[in-house]
Amino acid sequence: MRKTTRLVEIRTARASEQGGRCFYCGFPMWSANGLGARGLQKGKWIPANLQCTAEHLLPRSDGGQDGRENVVAACRFCNQTRHRRGKVLPPNQYREHVQGRVRSGKWHSAAVRRFVE
């Protein structure tokens, strides 16, 4: 099995286990195979930031592997934002940070928040 196919299977399984919601922010996600797209079909525009990605809890750059124990499903925005920081926060610390920002309405854009309401 190709590495990318295996990672897609792991991401899809993890997204299903997470109820189609991002590991960090809890927003619903969509993917090419339609997982999580139910309930996001309010119109033709689906925010790219809510695309489901495979998030490595321990980044590959730090030796993280592609196994189920190291991969969760995260929206594109949370995944990219975590890795754009100077120092990548540990997953639980980053999750707390993100959820605090979500509660204060300062995480996803207003358009994305309106889209999922």
Residue ranges, per PLM feature:
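Short, charged surface segments at domain edges that flank catalytic/cofactor-binding sites
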Residues: 1-39, 113
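Short amphipathic alpha-helical patches
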Residues: 34-37, 78-85, 98-102
